Amino acid sequence: FDKTLSPDNMQAQGFIQSVGYDVETFWKKSNGLASGNDMDQNLAYMLMMQQAAEGKKLFTRGELMKCGKEVMLFPGVKDWFKRICTYGEEHGVLVEHYIISSGLKEMIEGTDVAGEFKKIYASSFFYNEKGVAIWPAQVVNYTNKTQFLFRIEKGVLDINDPGVNDSFAPDEMRVPFRNMVYIGDSDTDVPCMKLVNVNGGYSIGVYNADTKDKTKVYKMMRENRIKYYAPADYSEGKELDILLKAIIDRTAEN
């Protein structure tokens, strides 16, 4: 989600500032917490959020969703989903959208596009009887992101359903990898991109069209992590829109 659909980390678009930190200091302290304690970086930022909010901000699902309402989206994102789904339907292809993110599920659920996804896989909190977040419920990092691709492939979407480990015949796969398109922006997406690529699907790297910094997508292309790259402009008629429609056309032909 972050820097794929939105130009910045979701936590940095209101929450961090609301608890008295500047963004750079927050992430520096969070990363130091992780490295100094052999701690997952995502668990570290979640703990930092919880501790920083004490005495300054209600740390509830509702407040986190409010922060999500402030998250900016790249051009064209808001109407992308219906447009691409409609194009797919017109060409005999059922299109579904999923989120696999190391960001916060609660914030994503507060965004304008939350209802466009069949399933949101992201880090999230457990809440006590007062509705206050007290413990991580789920943490999604760059390596365990891949499990969700297998869940999507097999149609076993419940995160606690062990059926994802069952053996499926190729013709039983609900969404074969060859029909998947994975869009991401950085190294955290590499395991998923590689998995989709080697199984015949399509991985696309995106970069911020305003900064025009292609460093990460060039690196991913050189290392065969992605098949294509494009500016993160989701507007109709732009490069990404044209590319996705071409992939839908190819899928329909096969």
Give, region by region, the residue ranges found by the protein language model.
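Low-complexity, serine/threonine/proline-enriched polar segments
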Residues: 34, 44-49, 126-161
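Amphipathic coiled-coil/heptad-repeat helices and related helical stalk/stem segments
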Residues: 77, 165-166, 189, 213
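Conserved Lys-Pro-Asp/Glu-containing loop-to-beta segment of HAD-superfamily phosphomonoesterases
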Residues: 145-188
